[in-house]
């Protein structure tokens, strides 16, 4: 009987290659993350040999980011995040603006159009969440003031990219692309742009409010129910269900990234007695 083993094969080969790459990188006195990246390239579609399913790999990567950001959120409280807002908020906005402008200028030098230049600049303006957090953990800086500022910076970048991804389709006509408007929409582009932007900001605001008000009560309560059963398995399952479920619901209902939803889930849990 033939079985579909795409998921098993990509997990098995991925873990084996990541282990080998991490060990080799450690022997060369490099961060293991370098070996993990090389392992990903080795089983990717642009190198000979085994090629992992890109769709499955992407979803597994998202799952890894969800669990990573949930764990990072457990190290933070809402007070920690608010304490660095005066640095992280303006700093991230200025950095995104400057990096986007520099990237767009470089693209203009390559002869690219305005739309391609803007997308290229935005891609250069944000940091890799996984790489930065792993580097902070490796240096023991995640729980320091610098680490909190860096995480706050990442949150601002994530929110900024949510807005950017909404605005880019609406701005496509003026940037040399094609508009992506909903079927049946015949209003003026300006009206559609501002309505879309307003709805996006409202969704993000509602998401933050729901997590800070409802999540601070609901998540600890549900985990408390699991803890009182005395079953370690049920408690672990409740934690995983909270991280993945909230991340998925946040993306589907409010349009935020999986990583941001998982981070807020971990952060609200950090303020409960069950965070350890």
From Swiss-Prot:
- How does the protein's chain sit in the membrane according to the entry? Multi-pass membrane protein
Q: Name one GO cellular component term.
A: plasma membrane
Q: Tell me which InterPro entries the record gives.
A: Cation/H_exchanger_TM, Na+/solute_symporter_sf
List, in alphabetical order, the Gene Ontology terms for molecular function in this entry: antiporter activity
- What GO terms describe the biological role, i.e. biological process, of this protein? proton transmembrane transport
Major place of residence: membrane
Q: Where in the cell is it found?
A: Cell membrane
What transmembrane ranges does the database entry give? 5-25, 32-52, 64-84, 104-124, 149-169, 193-213, 244-264
* The keyword Lipid metabolism belongs to this UniProt entry's keyword annotation: no
Q: Name the keywords, alphabetized.
A: Cell membrane, Membrane, Transmembrane, Transmembrane helix, Transport
Which Pfam families does UniProt cross-reference here?
A: Na_H_Exchanger
UniProt record similarity statement: Belongs to the monovalent cation:proton antiporter 2 (CPA2) transporter (TC 2.A.37) family.
In terms of PANTHER family, this protein maps to:
CATION_PROTON ANTIPORTER YBAL-RELATED, SODIUM/HYDROGEN EXCHANGER FAMILY/TRKA DOMAIN PROTEIN
What protein does this entry describe? Uncharacterized protein in phaC 3'region
């Amino acid at each position: 009987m033939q079985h579909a083993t795409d998921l098993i094969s990509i997990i098995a080969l991925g873990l084996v290659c990541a282990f080998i790459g991490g060990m080799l990188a450690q022997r060369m006195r490099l961060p293991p993350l370098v070996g993990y990246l090389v392992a990903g390239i080795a089983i990717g579609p642009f190198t000979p040999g085994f090629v992992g399913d890109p769709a499955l790999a992407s979803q597994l990567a998202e799952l890894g980011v969800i669990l990573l950001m949930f764990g990072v959120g457990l190290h933070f409280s809402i007070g920690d995040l608010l304490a660095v807002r005066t640095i992280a908020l303006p700093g991230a906005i200025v950095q995104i603006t400057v990096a986007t402008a520099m990237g767009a200028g470089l693209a203009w030098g390559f002869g690219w159009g305005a739309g391609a230049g803007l997308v290229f600049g935005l891609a250069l303006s944000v940091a890799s969440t996984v790489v930065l957090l792993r580097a902070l953990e490796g240096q023991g800086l995640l729980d320091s003031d610098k680490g909190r500022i860096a995480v706050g910076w990442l949150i601002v970048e994530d929110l900024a990219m949510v807005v950017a991804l909404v605005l880019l389709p609406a701005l496509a006509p003026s940037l040399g692309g094609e508009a992506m408007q909903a079927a049946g929409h015949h209003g003026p582009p300006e009206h559609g742009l501002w309505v879309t932007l307003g709805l996006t900001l409202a969704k993000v605001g509602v998401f933050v409010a729901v997590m800070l008000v409802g999540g601070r009560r609901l998540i600890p309560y549900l985990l408390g129910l699991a803890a009182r059963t005395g079953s370690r398995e049920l408690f672990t399952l409740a934690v995983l269900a909270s991280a993945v479920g909230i991340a998925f619901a946040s993306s589907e209902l409010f349009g935020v990234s999986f990583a941001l939803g998982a981070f807020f889930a971990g952060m609200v849990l950090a303020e409960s007695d069950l965070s350890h």
